[in-house]
Amino acid sequence: MSRNSRGSGRYVFVVLACVFGYTRAVHAEVYTDPSTSGHVTISIPIWAFVEPQPGVMTQQAESPRTPPPQTLRELGAFVLGGAVYGWRFSYTPKEKKRAVMEHFTLTPIFPLPPDSPQISLRHVRTPYPYIHCRAEYSLDARHATHMRQSRNLTYQRAQGRGRGERKEELKGVYHAYHRAIVDALRKTVRKTQKNKPKEVEGMLYVKDNPRLFVEAGEFVAELSLSVHFTKITPYSVY
């Protein structure tokens, strides 16, 4: 890592930022500062569009426009929360024979509000039509310890891909992320469970190489996750 360390005990999450087919390897840095009694700072690269998608939306169809700085704060809080603390989830696979529809819920283990004073946006650049920056989040020693301890559970690696409408702006980004998580869970259940379960519950967190790009008018999210099942509920009667 070429960036100078501000302290010791630094380790790295690798992140890929990909926009319109252009892929560039970047790094999400995690480093500790001995002068602040074990405090940890996480730095991740994020981006957003400066303007809405041109030429395809009417006033009625257009989703409410979130200003780019607020978009970056909300995206930063979402990704940082998933990488540091993770989420709890419940997932019900689709079962045609029982007329069961797929169902999914995702709950932050520790919610990060976008306006948290612990989140800062640094190194802002505006290569039109994008705005890039690094979102940084500072943890105190207690939360840094929780982050490390949570990684000691037995997790399974999972990868998923999801899509969301570009014209829906931030809502479309969230939809792409959520569908990527569902895709990863669906694949993991198929791989690990001999019989399709009624429901699975557990925890997951963003591991490495998350990608967000635009393809054919849609946001596409590709996530690498670590998944831990805490409860698997089988069907009692076939």
UniProtKB/Swiss-Prot annotation:
Residues 1-28 form the signal peptide. Keywords: Signal. It comes from the Bacteria. This is Uncharacterized protein TP_0983. It comes from Treponema pallidum (strain Nichols). The lineage of its organism: Bacteria, Pseudomonadati, Spirochaetota, Spirochaetia, Spirochaetales.
